[in-house]
A protein has these predicted regions:
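Terminal export/targeting leaders at protein ends
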Residues: 1-84
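Short, cationic, amphipathic peptide segments
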Residues: 4-11, 80-106
Length: 106
């Protein structure tokens, strides 16, 4: 959770970015700490440490394989970044944004 607090501005900017190309550019140039912060948030989501609404859960249900791969710490940084770059739809990112809001409220 400390990593989430340190990388809060980056996470907010990347989750709120509506333009796909800008978001991909931000992810491409993100450093290891920033990618690890996204990975940690996803891991907390998968371990059910973050209470999320059923609506958010339904948004993210379609992306369960990607979430598992991003949350898996055994995967290299490059591989986790590639999985995040492949996500082009808004459902994945808006679901993670709702998850981030739930993390910050706690």
């Amino acid at each position: 959770m400390r990593r989430l607090r340190r990388q809060r501005p980056f996470l907010q900017s990347i989750l709120k970015e509506a333009n796909q190309k800008k978001r991909q550019k931000m992810l491409t140039h993100a450093n290891a700490d920033q990618i690890n912060a996204v990975s940690e948030m996803v891991l907390n989501l998968l371990k059910k440490r973050v209470p999320i609404k059923p609506k958010t859960f339904d948004k993210l249900k379609r992306h369960k394989t990607v979430l598992r791969e991003v949350g898996r710490r055994r995967n290299s940084l490059k591989r986790r970044r590639e999985y995040l770059l492949k996500q082009t739809g808004r459902g994945f990112w808006s679901g993670l944004e709702d998850c981030f809001k739930a993390c910050c409220v706690r």
